[in-house]
Amino acid sequence: PATMIFRQNTTTQGGARAGLEFVQHDGGREEAGFRGRADCVVRAICLITGESYNHVREDLSYLQKKMTGGLYPSIADGVMTPVHYLYLTGKGWELTLTKNAYLPDIPRDGHFIAVIPRHVMAIRHGTVWDAWDSRFSRRTKSGYPRLLGYYSPPAA
């Protein structure tokens, strides 16, 4: 199995978190002929890897069906966490778990797939690439969503 790294909250100098920029992008969903919701994992993977939406969707659907014994044959209602974990780590991605961290605490130097509660998003050099502006949360005092962890791409 893949290695997991734990990363503590890393606020910027002086304790202030710098904001993240946002770019709206559907990851190729519309071009592939899909509409709707619950495809954040597919979008994030496509936006970071450049793979086609259909290819990633087919791979994740197959893996979810296989991992659940056919109980969940489709990813139409979303991709289960163990499925995207196995998919990404199987391709050499490394998961870093974060403790007491919020979205702005993600590293700014590179491409990552961020995992927040009930959502996954692409981060490119400190900019959120997503179908909707997912940078903020009303559920936390800071106004930012908790960062549960992030995937880093395989070393070149």
Where are the regions that the model predicts?
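Active-site nucleophile-adjacent alpha helix/oxyanion-hole segment immediately C-terminal to the catalytic cysteine
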Residues: 4-74, 91
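Conserved active-site-adjacent core of cysteine acyl-enzyme catalytic domains
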Residues: 64-118, 124-133, 141-142, 146
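Glycine-rich, aromatic-bearing surface loops/beta-hairpins
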Residues: 136-156
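Solvent-exposed, well-ordered amphipathic alpha-helical segments
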Residues: 6-8, 17-18, 105-112, 123-128, ...
